[in-house]
Every structure is written in C-alpha cells, then in structure tokens.
Amino acid sequence: MTGRCLIKYSFTPMMTGSQVRRRFLDFFISKGHKEVHSSSLVPANDPTLLFTNAGMNQFKDVFLGVEKRDYNRATTSQKCVRAGGKHNDLENVGFTNRHHTFFEMLGNFSFGDYFKKDAIAYAWELVTSPDWYGMQQDKLYATIFKGENGVPRDDEAYQLWLDVGVPKERVFEMGMKDNFWAMGDTGPCGPCSELHYDMGVASSDKKNPECAAGECKFPCECGRYVEIWNLVFMQFDRDASGTLNPLPKPSIDTGAGLERVTAVMQGVVSNYDTDLFTPLIKRAAELTDVDEKREEAKESQSKSAASLRVIADHSRAATFLISDGVIPANEGRGYVLRKIIRRGIRHGRLLGQNKPFLHDMVYAVRDLMQDAYPELKETADRVAKTVLAEETRFANTLDIGLKKLDEDLASLAETTRELGRLSWEEPKPVEFALKEVARHVFVVAQMLSPGMTFDTPGHGFLLRRGIYRAWMDLKAVGLDRVVRLSEIAEALSEGETGRVQSVAKNLAHTKQILDAEQERLQSASSQLEFELDAMEAEKKLAENPEMLAEQVREVFGPALEEKVINELRGKLQSRPVYSGDKAFKLYDTFGLPLDFMVDAARDQGIEFDQAGFDAAMESQRETARASWKGGSKLSASPIYRELAEELGTKPYPGQLAGGHPMITPQSIFVGYTSTEFKGATVLAIISNGASVAQLAPGDVAEMVLDYTPFYSESGGQIGDTGWLYDSTGNTVVAEVETVQSPVQGVRAHKVTARQNIAVGDKLNAVVNADVRRATMRNHTGTHLLHAALREVLGKHVKQAGSLVDPAKLRFDFSHFTGVADEELQDIEDIVNKEVLKNDRVEVIENVPIDVAVNEYKAMALFGEKYGDRVRVIKIGDFSTELCGGTHTLATGEIGLIKVLHEGSVSSGVRRLEAVTGENSVRHFRKDHELEGVVSTIVRPSEGLSPAQALKFELDRREEEIKKLRKELEQSRMKSASSAVSSATESAREVKGIKVLATRADNIDRNQMRTLIDNLRSKLGSGVIVLGSVQDGKVALIVGVTKDLTSKIQAGKIIAQVAKHVGGSGGGRPDMAEAGGKDPAALDGALNATYGIVDSLLS
C-alpha cells in the first residue's frame, strides 16, 4: 500500500475539510441548535482534566444540572488535545493513520430536549442525504449496546436504526467497553451508538490475508471499518451503590472526529492525506528539505513520511495550545506542550534539519485554519516566538544533555569498557567471533616471528590486514576496549606445540606491535577505510592467507580456544547498567530522546535500565497530574455537589433578559455594592469533608450562607475576610478567613467559631472593608497595567495568570524578553495618568458573551470560564475586560501605582509586581530613607540621582573586585606552578616509568589541567597525578604521556586513587579526572599512587 491510498466514492466532487466542518454546524443550526464557539483547550474550573479532550467538556456543568444556558440544543466544532494522562496518543502520532495530538470534535448536544429518536434520525440524515454529506448507505454500519453487567440491551436504539433504513445485518451489538459511556464512577451515564464507515481496505498492521484481500467483515480491527460518529444517550444517573436511576431529563452528547469524516469525504485511508494536513506536510517537507513527493511514492510507514506527519500534527497542537495560553514548562500542561514541541523538533532532526524550523509551521497552521479560528490571526506572532524560544532552548539543552550522557557512559565504561553488543545469552555468535579473533592474532604472531614488519613488501599488507580483522571481530562483540590483542597473543603462547612455542619466543615484539596498532585503530578509526583502500594495491604481492589459516587450524586445539574464551568471559561478569533514573533526568531536563540514549548505551555495550526509566516517567506523570489538579482551593468533594443538589435552586435577584432566571444553588453573592448583609441564614456546615449540624467555640470549618457579601476567590482575586455577628449585631460568633467556591454557586466560608453556631441560625455578615478596599485598588490597578503593557509592548501581551490581594498585585503576561527599565517607566507613567484622570469604572451586568467580545471589545482573562452572559468592567476608553471581581468606583481611588519588580516566570511568560494606594506611599518612604543612607556612603555625582550614584559606585567596586580576584588567581597559579615544577625532580621510577604524585591547593580544575600539560612536557615521558583541595573538596587529575597509554591508562589510575578520598572518576587514556569528599586523605592517596601504578603495570 502506498502512502496515499485513494478510494473513489459516488459523492463527488470532493468536499474540503472546512466544508465538512461548516456543513455539520449548518445542518444542526437548521435543526434548531445554537452554534457555540469552541472552548479553550485549557479547561475552565475543571481540575479533573489536563486538556479539553471532548466536545462535551464545556457543557459538563450543564449536564450535571449546576449550570443553566439560555438554549437547550447546541452544536460545536471543539478543539481537543489528547497527549497526556488517561488519553495519551502521543507515541502513536505519525505512525498510524488516525492518531493525533490535536483534533476537532464535531458534536450536537441536547440538554433535556430531544433524545434517541431525533439524535439517530439527525445523524442518519446528515451522513446520507445528498444535500449534506451523501455517504454511501451500503458502506455504513451502526452499533448498539448489547446489554452487560446487569444493564439491559438498548432495544430502542436498535429499532430506531432499523427505522431510519439501516439493514439489520449492518446493526451490531457491542459490549460495555465500546458502547456504554459514563462521566465517572458516579453521575450521568448511558448506552451509546456508533456509526462506522467501510473504507474498503485495511490500514493497520492488524490484518490477515482476508483483510489484505478486502474480504474481512465488520467489526474487524484492521482499520478498514472506521468509527466516524459516537452518539451518547445520557439516560441514567449511577449512584454510589452502582444502581442506575433514570434521569428525569435524558440528554444527548455526540462526537464525530472532523479528521475522520473528512478522510471519508475525500476518499483517502489516512487522515494525513486530507487537506486538513497535506498543506502542513508540504510545508514541513520544504522546511526540512525533504522530497515530499518522493516520500509519498514510498510506503506510508517510511521513517521520513512518519516524521513529516509528526511535524504536521505537532505544529497544530503547539499552535493551538500556546494560542490558548499554555506556555512550555517543566510541569503540568506546560510540560506536555514542551514534549510535543520537542518531539516535533526531534523528527525535524531525523530529517536532517538541525536549525530552528518548527516556529515557521505556526504560520502554515494559521493560514490553513484561520477561517474557522480567527483568533489565530492575532496570536500567530506570539505563538511563533514562543516556539522559536523553545527551539533555541532545546538546542542548547540538547548539547548539554549529550555531553552529560557521554560523561555518564564514559564513567561506566571505565570500569568495564564497552561490553558486547551481543549478549552472553547468545553464546554461539559470540564464541565464533572470539575464535576468529584468536585465529587472526595467531596468524599475525606467526608472521611476526621471523621479524616481519609493516614495511615488508606484500606481507606487510597481510600483517596489517590481519590485525585489523582481529580488531574488527573484537569490536563486533564490543570488546575492543576491554581486551588487548596483546593479551590474546600471550594466552596463545602458552601451549605445547612447536608453532605455539615459536610465538612465545617472540612474544615481547608481538605484543608491542599489536598494542601500537590497536591504539592507532582506536584513535583513528574514522580514517581506516581510506587507509585500507590505499593498501589494496599491494594485494597482488600477498601470499595466500588461506595457507596460514590451515596451519592455525592444525595447532589450534580445543583447550586453547576454551582458555581464551574463558579469559574474556571472566571480564564480562559485571556488565554495567545505565541508570533509568539518570536517563530520565536527561530526558526530562535536557530533552534527550529515549531511543537515542538506549542506542548510545548499547553502542558502548552498556545495559539500559528501561524499568527504572519507566518508573521515573510514571513518577513525573503523577507529579504533573498533581500540579494541575489543584493548589489552595477547596477540593470539589462530593459533599459540595450533593449540597448544591440538596439546596435546590432559586432565582437570582437580577433576572436575565427575556425573563430567564439564573438557576444556581442557594448561595447568593450580594457584595458588589455592600460589605454587609443582615439576616443571612446558615444553610450548611462542612467539617473535615462531612456535613455537621453545629460548631463549638474554636472549631474550624466551612460554612454556607444563603446570602453573602463575601467575595469568593476567583479570577486571581483572593476571597474576602471579615466577621459573622449574631442577629443582634453585637457579638462576633465567627471570624471569616477566606471564601472559596468548590462548585459553581456554592460559596464556602472558612471560619473559626467564637460562639456556638448551628445550621439555620440567622447571622449578620460583615466584610473587612479596609481589606476589601485595598484589594479593589489592586484589582482595578491590574486592569490598568494590562492595558498599559499592551500599549507599550504590543498587542501580543495577554494575561497568563494573576494574584490580587490587599498587599500587592501580581500579573503574569505573555512576552518573550525582559521589559526594559525605560519600558517599565513608560508603563508606570501611563497607568498613573489614568489614575489622575479619575475615570469612572463602569460595571455592565448580564451582557451576552458575543456582544461583550464583539461590540465592547472586552478582553477575556486566561483560564476563566464564562457563561452566555457576562460582567464587563469598562474604564473609560482605556480598558475593557470581562471580570467578576470587585473594583473601585473610579480610578482616582487607586491613589498611585508603583511597579516593584519585573522578571521571568517561564519561557515566554513574564511577571510584574506592583503596589497601590497606601502601600505605594510606604514604598516611596522606604526609597527616601534609602537615599539618605546612600548619601552617607556614596558622594553624589553631578547629574546622577542617589540611586544612579549608588549603581555607579557598585559597578566600579565590582570591576575592582574582579581585577583583584584575577590577580590572586594568577598569583596562586604562579606559586603552584613553581612548587610543582620543582617537584619534578622528586619523580620516582616505577618499572622504568617516571611517576610524579603531588598536590597544588586552592587552584581550580582548569588551572590543574594547565599544570598537568606543563608537567607532561617537562617530564617528556611519564605519569603525573595532581591533587588539590579547594573549598573543602578534593580534585584529582591524572595525566599520562601519549607514548605510555598503551601500557597504562589514566582512567584506571584515577579509579583507584580516587577511592582513597571517597570519590570516583574517569576519562581518556591520557587524561582523567575525579572528585573526592575527604581532604584529609589526599596526601595518603597521592602516596598510594606509586603502588597503584606498579600494580597496574604488573
């Protein structure tokens, strides 16, 4: 099957993806549905979801009965992401035809209005009518719930499908796994029906000859039969005991994947071959310099084709996630976004594109999807800059991660160097290779016995070729750095035959040649092929190597073979393992791909701890889940939802337009215009997650009142504090610490009781007015700052979070670089001019959301959930936002706004902190006091403010300190160099090699390396071990001159020396480093060096 498989259907001409989306919405509008715009990918006020992953998410509270809309039929095309948590399609994306991280879910919904009959009739009409989709009826299959686990079969749906015209042989029964839906362990649930389309050909690996021949039957899972629509019939309410109780108003929730429906309408097997993706794949091919047409002619599962699909998909997900306010981070949603971006970058690298490119894909996504999602026109530049920043960051961290991986693997390989790629569980290929090594070494030893060299005509080629083949066979099993060829020659020399004895007589010369050539091969392996090609010309002079091979076989007895194999096998007993935890840190921190690390470890013969990696990954996922599930807010435990249902509903005092009351639990906020309410009734008391009847003095609990002036924490503004008085208003019965809304409409007051309080008591609620006023100043100031930031920095600035309390305001916003001091000054000047204008802060209640956004041009705040009607805060012509918080009556009440700090929160997100009112005055008073102190330290310079004069003096002194520090380091280096150089005279000879072990304290590693190089030059040939103590830590460096690395390696020396100071280390044969924890043991470690070298040489 080729990459693009076309199937000719009768419904032509081909419908575009945009037309498929629009036609779905128009069909349901014609059936009395309201078109509702897609909600954000960041679920509002739903801690159970990482991302919006279904069309019904934005209607969840409507289905649960805690929210009322002014329509009971809706249709949407909902943006969805499944790349984390329960629904995680990330690893499959690009390698299958229908997995995506970002997708659109077409849906129609009924909130207690029509039910199964109309839902099934609508679905069938839309997909089969020539006026709409016009799919071939004989290609469609329906499924129903067959009945399972005590839940009856959905006979009604079965009959309804027959009634609309589906033959009974194409209506199939499925179990609870496929055809029963539930919102959770308890709550709304019900059977569902699916529509599947026969694509005519299999499209997955799960196929047999019947599938390949197109003879398989529904519901074969080979990919031939594609689910295009799921109709959920919410007709039950499952209680805690598992009993299914009929819902008084059954509802409908359907979902049809736009990408799948479009594939059917365009006659292609793969979603990636639809016009929803092909422009993106084409752009990805251009940016990665891949011949996309050539790849299309190949198998669709080719690596290049898969990588292009990954880039196309991930660019969609990244564009929409960032557009909706998600920023790359190391936890929660930001972490998933970072993984998506980095996976896209990695697949670009697999295609040979190592430069930033993914940010360019953002504009391709915008051009393709801006008609359906016009917000992309405004956000594209911001999104592209965020992706580019992440690409740059990833490139930097990748280099650091690769270096760290090399260090980790080198440290492991120092103990047992590069163990075999072939496992000892497969002895035959390993033993065969080892025997070949021994055979080649024996042949070389025989040739060297008469004094032959590499310069000997003809035979010189055979000699070098024989060593090369021995080395390559050794390398094939990963032992080229474990075993010396000279060791094998020595083992071969211990035999009884005359030929073996002849090898023994010339063993020293043989070992010297083998060591030198192996060292050359190790260090210059990249040039080998060139060198060997140059030697091909000498082949005609060579003697027949087969003759020597026959002689080897005559004398190569089983005992000797076994001896060599056993010797090598003994070196393989402790196979090193690369820690999965370490690998995950590189994956998580530096973005190193898992398969890259596995391959790198395997290439060096090191086992990879996959189980440890998986455990670390799962631990991180748990942390990520926790990071987005909640914070300081009260958990929405079942008690609050039960309370909302128990309390019933009550019309809000200000009814909505058209006479529709806002249905909400009996917990009404009346604090916009007053900070007191007399006669509030205690509706419920919650203590430790359970409902209680009363509180005693000192008890801490949450209390729900029917009417309250206390603002509940929302939109970044903290909850009010204050007091609850008895009905006389004279006695405080409880202190209110904060107020939160665990479920919509229920305002839970966290209180500490001073008197006995019982459910049903009448109390007077009084907000701390001073704290409220300070909070209001900061909240209105936040709106002014938001508008000023957009004016100074650009319209890409959007709120990314906020905190408003009485002491200060904190505002997080999208921006890519630090805000310059001059820009901060401009922002501060602009907002204070608005304060001085004393403009009225206009509050406009119950505005239809579309009017607020399109006519008032109100800005919606990040992460907030809005209903059909909203509250607009308008400050002159300067700022208009959707906001439910409390505000000053006019800007003049703010007094003064002072910006305290601006800094980075994460990539692409900045944070600004400021104070208003009395706190601004306090800040200026502190500044004035500081200026007085500065004037006593720094002599004021002409034209400089005290702050500027202080900065000038600090900069001057910092430069002076840097100069003195440099002079001190140079002095230390000079002193250490002099002392160490004089110590060369005390170098000892160990088995004919000069060895110097000395210390030079209070110098850094770079200086130590310089000393090592100087000492090696001075000694000419030898081993140097240098130790140093600085800041209570031991540093060790070993240097071996090049001429000695075949006999003794720096890494082996340092491994043993470091043990004496409680450390470890590794490195190259000529240079190795280590650290240690025991400074007192350094002298002993250096003294032990000579014995260690002697032992290693033995």
From Swiss-Prot:
EC number: 6.1.1.7
Keyword tags: Aminoacyl-tRNA synthetase, ATP-binding, Cytoplasm, Ligase, Metal-binding, Nucleotide-binding, Protein biosynthesis, RNA-binding, tRNA-binding, Zinc
Subcellular localization(s) per the UniProt record: Cytoplasm
Gene Ontology cellular component list: cytosol
Cofactor note: Binds 1 zinc ion per subunit.
Catalytic activity from the UniProt record: tRNA(Ala) + L-alanine + ATP = L-alanyl-tRNA(Ala) + AMP + diphosphate
MF GO annotations: alanine-tRNA ligase activity; aminoacyl-tRNA deacylase activity; ATP binding; tRNA binding; zinc ion binding
GO BP of this protein: alanyl-tRNA aminoacylation; negative regulation of DNA-templated transcription
Binding site for Zn(2+): 779, 783, 883, 887
Highest rank taxon of the organism: Bacteria
Cofactor: Zn(2+)
Pfam family, one: tRNA_SAD
Family per record: Belongs to the class-II aminoacyl-tRNA synthetase family.
Its biological purpose: Catalyzes the attachment of alanine to tRNA(Ala) in a two-step reaction: alanine is first activated by ATP to form Ala-AMP and then transferred to the acceptor end of tRNA(Ala). Also edits incorrectly charged Ser-tRNA(Ala) and Gly-tRNA(Ala) via its editing domain.
Written domain comment of the UniProt record: Consists of three domains; the N-terminal catalytic domain, the editing domain and the C-terminal C-Ala domain. The editing domain removes incorrectly charged amino acids, while the C-Ala domain, along with tRNA(Ala), serves as a bridge to cooperatively bring together the editing and aminoacylation centers thus stimulating deacylation of misacylated tRNAs.
Protein name stated in the entry: Alanine--tRNA ligase
Record organism: Koribacter versatilis (strain Ellin345)
